[in-house]
Curated annotation (Swiss-Prot):
Domain EH: 8-98, 130-222
Entry keyword annotation includes Nucleotide-binding: no
This protein's name: Actin cytoskeleton-regulatory complex protein END3
Domain EF-hand: 40-75, 146-164
Any coiled-coil regions, as ranges: 244-345
Species per Swiss-Prot/TrEMBL record: Candida glabrata (strain ATCC 2001 / BCRC 20586 / JCM 3761 / NBRC 0622 / NRRL Y-65 / CBS 138) (Yeast)
Subunit record text: Component of the PAN1 actin cytoskeleton-regulatory complex.
C-alpha cells in the first residue's frame, strides 16, 4: 500500500469541499453516494467507515475523510485484498494518534472479557437410537459387493442431512476412520464416520487427530475374505504352524465360556441400554460361532490340493482370537457397569 501523495490530498479536499461540510465535518448521509458508487460490499464499507471515524461521532472531519477515501480507492484499485483490522501508522493523523491508542486498548479489554468457548470433543459412544438412525442412512448408500461403502456414497448421503459440514470435514474424518486408506470401509467404521460428522455438524466438535485405542482396533481390523481365490488366501505366514483340531477345540471352549458369561450378565442386568449392548455382543458371538463351524468343516474335510485353505484358516484363527480378547475386555466393562447399577438400586 503506497503512502499518501500530496496530489491525493488535494483531490480528496476537492471532493470533501464539494460535499458542503458543516463545521468542517461531513455526515454519513453526505458520504453515502460516494460509498455506493464504489460498488464495494456493504460489510467492507462499514469496516472502512469504522476505521475512518476515529472519534466515533458518526461524522468525518477532513483527516478522517482522507482515511476513508484512501481505503476505498485502494480496495477499488485492488492495491489491497482486504480492509486492515487496524490503520497503518502512516495513515494515522498525528492529532488522532492518542484516540487510536485508546480505541485499541478498549478493544483489547473487551476481547479479554469475552469468555472463550472450548470446542467439545467427540463422544464416541453410539446409543441404540443413534445406531438405528445411522443404519437408516447407510441403507440409502449403494454398498459394494462385499458389503462395504465408499467415501462417495457416504458423503452423498450426508450432504442432504448435515448442512454445517464441508468436504474438508468429511475428508479429514474419512482419513481418521480409514487409516489404511482403503477404497471402501466396513459397516462399523462407517457408523463411526457418520457419528463423528453428526457431532461436528450439531455442536461443532473438533475432529480428533487419532482414534481411541479400542476404536482404532475396530477400524484397523483385517477383513476376512471367504473366497479362497482371493489374494488374502495367498498370504504366507512363515512363523505360523498349521492349525490342528486342538486349536479349534480351544477356540470353541473360549466361545462357550464367553457365551456363558453373557448369559449370566443378561440375567442380572437391570438396564435396558445394557441389555441392548449385550444383544449386540450376542450377535457378534453368533457370527464367531458360525465361522468356527465353517473352519471345523475345513479341518474335517481338507483339500489336499490347496495350501491356501490351511493358511486361510490360520489367519482367521488369529483374527478371531483377537476379537474374543476384545469381547472379554468388553464383558469386564459391562460387569462393572452392572455392579454400579445394582449399587444404585440398592441405595434407593
Amino acid at each position: 500500500m503506497p503512502k499518501l501523495e500530496q496530489f491525493e490530498i488535494k483531490k480528496y479536499w476537492q471532493i470533501f469541499s464539494g460535499l458542503k461540510p458543516v463545521e468542517n465535518k461531513v455526515s454519513h448521509d453526505q458520504v453515502l453516494p460516494i460509498l455506493y458508487n464504489s460498488k464495494l460490499d456493504s460489510s467492507i464499507l462499514n469496516k472502512i467507515w469504522f476505521l475512518a471515524d476515529i472519534d466515533d461521532d458518526d461524522n468525518l472531519d477532513f483527516e478522517e475523510f482522507v482515511i476513508c477515501m484512501r481505503l476505498i480507492f485502494d480496495m477499488v484499485n485492488k492495491n489491497i485484498d482486504s480492509v486492515p483490522d487496524e490503520l497503518p501508522e502512516w495513515l494515522v493523523p498525528g492529532s488522532k494518534a492518542k484516540l487510536i491508542k485508546e480505541r485499541q486498548k478498549a478493544k483489547q479489554q473487551e476481547n479479554a472479557e469475552i469468555p472463550r468457548q472450548e470446542v467439545p470433543d467427540v463422544d464416541w459412544y453410539i446409543s441404540p437410537e443413534d445406531k438405528t438412525y445411522y443404519e437408516k442412512i447407510l441403507s440409502t448408500c449403494g454398498p459394494m459387493a462385499d458389503g462395504t461403502v465408499t467415501f462417495a456414497e457416504l458423503s452423498l448421503a450426508l450432504k442432504s442431512k448435515f448442512f454445517n459440514i464441508g468436504v474438508s470435514d468429511m475428508e479429514r474424518t474419512w482419513k481418521l476412520i480409514n487409516p489404511r486408506d482403503l477404497p471402501s470401509i466396513d459397516r462399523d467404521p462407517a457408523m463411526y464416520f457418520i457419528h463423528c460428522l453428526r457431532q461436528r455438524n450439531d455442536i461443532g466438535t473438533s475432529i480428533p487427530s487419532e482414534l481411541p485405542p479400542a476404536l482404532a482396533e475396530v477400524c484397523n481390523k483385517q477383513r476376512v475374505e471367504y473366497d479362497l481365490s482371493s489374494k488374502q488366501a495367498d498370504l504366507k505366514r512363515l512363523d505360523t504352524k498349521e492349525p490342528t483340531k486342538n486349536d479349534v477345540t480351544k477356540l470353541g471352549d473360549e466361545l462357550d465360556r464367553l457365551e456363558h458369561s453373557l448369559e449370566n450378565l443378561t440375567t442380572g442386568s437391570t438396564s435396558s441400554t445394557l441389555q441392548g449392548t449385550i444383544k449386540m455382543s450376542k450377535e457378534s458371538l453368533n457370527q464367531f460361532k458360525g465361522l468356527l463351524a465353517f473352519m471345523e468343516n475345513d479341518l474335517n474335510h481338507p483339500n489336499p490340493d490347496s495350501n491356501a485353505n490351511v493358511k486361510y484358516v490360520t489367519d482367521d484363527l488369529d483374527n478371531i482370537d483377537q476379537q474374543v480378547q476384545m469381547l472379554e475386555t468388553y464383558l469386564q466393562q459391562k460387569r462393572q457397569e452392572l455392579g454400579s447399577l445394582k449399587a444404585e438400586v440398592g441405595s434407593t
